[in-house]
């Protein structure tokens, strides 16, 4: 069966699907769940972001499926580099899990790689966009103690006293402090669920037996990243039409999903509309719950 993981054939989809599901479940249990359990036993909160959250093919390769890892955290968190306002999936994956499990806080590491000339206007613009998608707490990147040597060019800016605008930064902080407080006093209500197509990515992601010519450009990765871009466009267009939505990961659905009074339920959230895009296959648990 192993050759089917590398070569395309009639059994390739199942072999790859089962492989990546196993990787995802074992990584979660051996890493995220253990860290989360240890933190709670020692009166700590577990948070942090995972790698390549924004690229569907790469995310599968390094995480299996990233959303189940968020379920192990006390504070779900992401990292959004540069002045990005076109990529919705990273925020939505994280905020959806927080919403479904009733965790409350959604933390975002912001402003990395924006440069020394990044303005207050830019910080508000990027922050407002992420807050509209579900973030409610910022973690600014970064606060350097010193600018000596290579530090000056290490993913600026530095949100600290070594910037010219530090004494005026209260203006930005007060704004986001009030916005964070207001949003965390309430609960988001989203009635539309979009099923995440990661299990389809599992069935497509193989590996070339002849090696990889370029890092992050392995044989199947680019096309799966394109699938992620198309999925992102769907979520973006829903939001632009004012249909705010949560994403539904099938592993989380299998654990927390149910049906009640014509509603599709995941944890603490109820949905009256379920969209299933780009799904070439479903976990049996998802299929059963949807058909109910």
Name the predicted role of every residue range.
Residues 1-292:
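Carbohydrate-binding surfaces of carbohydrate-active enzymes
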């Amino acid at each position: 069966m192993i050759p089917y993981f590398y070569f395309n054939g009639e059994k390739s989809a199942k072999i790859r699907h089962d492989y990546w599901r196993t990787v995802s479940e074992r990584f979660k249990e051996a890493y995220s769940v253990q860290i989360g359990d240890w933190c709670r036993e020692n009166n700590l909160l577990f948070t942090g972001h995972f790698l390549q959250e924004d690229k569907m093919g790469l995310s599968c390769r390094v995480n299996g499926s990233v959303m189940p890892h968020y379920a192990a955290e006390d504070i779900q968190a992401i990292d959004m580099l540069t002045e990005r306002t076109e990529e919705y999936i990273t925020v939505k994956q994280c905020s959806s899990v927080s919403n479904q499990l009733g965790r409350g806080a959604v933390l975002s590491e912001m402003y990395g790689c924006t440069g020394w000339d990044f303005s207050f206007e830019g910080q508000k613009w990027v922050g407002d966009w992420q807050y509209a998608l579900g973030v409610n707490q910022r973690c600014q990147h970064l606060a350097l103690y010193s600018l000596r040597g290579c530090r000056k060019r290490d993913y600026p800016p530095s949100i600290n006293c070594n910037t010219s605008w530090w004494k005026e930064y209260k203006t930005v902080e007060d704004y986001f402090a009030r916005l964070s407080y207001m949003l965390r006093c309430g609960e988001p209500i989203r009635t539309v669920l979009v099923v995440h197509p990661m299990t389809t990515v599992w069935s497509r992601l193989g590996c070339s037996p002849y090696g990889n010519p370029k890092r992050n450009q392995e044989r199947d990765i680019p096309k799966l990243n394109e699938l992620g871009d198309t999925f992102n466009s769907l979520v973006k267009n829903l939001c632009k039409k004012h249909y705010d939505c949560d994403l539904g990961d099938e592993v989380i659905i299998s654990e927390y999903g149910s049906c009640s009074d014509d509603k599709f339920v995941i944890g603490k959230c109820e949905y009256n509309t379920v969209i299933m895009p780009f799904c070439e296959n479903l976990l049996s648990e998802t299929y059963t719950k949807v058909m109910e």
